[in-house]
């Protein structure tokens, strides 16, 4: 490993990358000037630098209760109308569903999470395909399903899609990739002498789906809404009533939030820098009490397709410290919820319990065992199982 931290030496190290690694980085939209600039920023006191980089400026305040709408309740006249509006949009080809599938199940043996069995002998990927098949059958047309993969998951997922004979409207696109640096800003090399690559966070989705051409083609064909969620949150399925509510709203992005329970940590909606936006706790002003906000982000978003395609978005790159081969390293990541800073956002509180639950994430084997009955009940109630 080199300790030189000047941009010139990092640039020279990047020049020396193998052709194979360069090709992989290029395919994943690697931004060389950005990494060189970020490396050069690794100076001064670490805590001060991270506070300056990560925390929003100015004051923050909790949203009012009127700014968090409840999800449409089943059985009401209003919900029936919204459901009809949403179903009509799906039948007209106006919806695409995106699943973020770049993660490895590090607490489940380090395998590709999409290929982990979730319930009833079916993997997360198989359940997402089954969900899409049911939705497409009801709509009377294929509903586009796009899977954002990472360098680690792309090939296994594409092989699984081939093996499962996934329909042509199921596509994959590759999220971004970058290289880890030393704490001083030099290119980190592992015990094998090779650079250490990493995925750069789910905030990559916007640039990645633009780069893929899928979004542009979808918009040209009349697509209007992109629904985005995590692979492992099987509760986050397409709800026509929520879609209808978003269609009727003036917002460009709708965020699904749910009530906090003990132990929950995640981004929360707050007023900051002139926007009601989702911020992780490390981004909040030091004097802001996160407990004053009783809901948090489920990482499920509905976004206007044209805004997702064309809106100018200035991304923050967040400094994350990791350890590789026993050495401290720095990697830079983006967060998808920054959409709520760039686009006008609205928030909908969704249930997290019962067959209507929309927040059922799975992070480890114990949670999978605990959640399996809830997942099964939710999917059965929606006609997926």
Task: List PLM regions with ranges.
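N-terminal glycine-rich phosphate-binding loop and ensuing alpha1 helix
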Residues: 3-171, 179, 188-198, 202-206, ...
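Solvent-exposed, flexible loop/coil residues
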Residues: 112, 119-122, 183, 213, ...
């Amino acid at each position: 490993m080199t300790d030189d931290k000047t941009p010139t030496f990092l640039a020279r190290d990047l020049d020396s990358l193998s052709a194979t690694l360069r090709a992989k980085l290029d395919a994943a939209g690697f931004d060389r000037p950005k990494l060189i600039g970020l490396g050069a920023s690794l100076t001064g006191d670490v805590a001060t630098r991270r506070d300056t980089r990560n925390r929003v400026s100015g004051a923050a305040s909790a949203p009012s209760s009127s700014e968090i709408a409840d999800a449409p309740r089943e059985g009401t006249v209003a919900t029936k109308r919204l459901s009809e509006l949403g179903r009509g949009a799906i039948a007209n080809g106006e919806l695409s569903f995106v699943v973020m599938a770049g993660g490895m199940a590090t607490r489940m043996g380090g395998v590709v999470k999409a290929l982990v069995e979730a319930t009833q002998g079916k993997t997360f990927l198989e359940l997402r395909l089954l969900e899409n098949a049911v939705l497409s059958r009801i709509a009377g047309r294929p509903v586009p399903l796009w899977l954002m993969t990472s360098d680690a998951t792309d090939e296994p997922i594409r092989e699984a899609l081939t093996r499962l004979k996934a329909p042509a409207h199921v596509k994959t696109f590759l999220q971004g990739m970058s290289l880890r640096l030393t704490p001083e800003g030099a290119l980190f090399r592992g015990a094998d002498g090779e650079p250490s690559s990493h995925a750069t966070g789910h905030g990559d989705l916007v640039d990645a789906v633009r780069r893929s051409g899928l979004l542009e083609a979808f918009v040209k064909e009349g697509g209007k809404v992109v629904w985005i969620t995590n692979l492992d949150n099987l509760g986050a399925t397409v709800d026509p009533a929520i879609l209808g509510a978003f269609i009727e709203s003036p917002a460009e992005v709708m965020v699904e939030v749910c009530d906090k329970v003990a132990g929950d940590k995640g981004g929360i909606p707050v007023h900051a820098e002139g926007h009601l936006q989702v911020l992780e706790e490390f981004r909040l002003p030091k004097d802001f009490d996160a407990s004053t906000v009783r809901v948090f982000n489920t990482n499920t978003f509905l976004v206007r397709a044209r805004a997702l395609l064309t809106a100018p978005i200035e991304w923050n790159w967040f400094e994350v410290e990791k350890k590789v081969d026993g050495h401290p390293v720095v990697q830079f990541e983006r967060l998808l919820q920054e959409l709520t800073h760039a686009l006008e956002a609205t928030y909908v509180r969704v249930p997290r319990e019962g067959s209507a639950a929309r927040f059922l994430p799975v992070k480890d084997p114990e949670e999978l065992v605990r959640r399996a009955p809830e997942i099964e009940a939710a999917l059965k109630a929606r006609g997926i199982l």
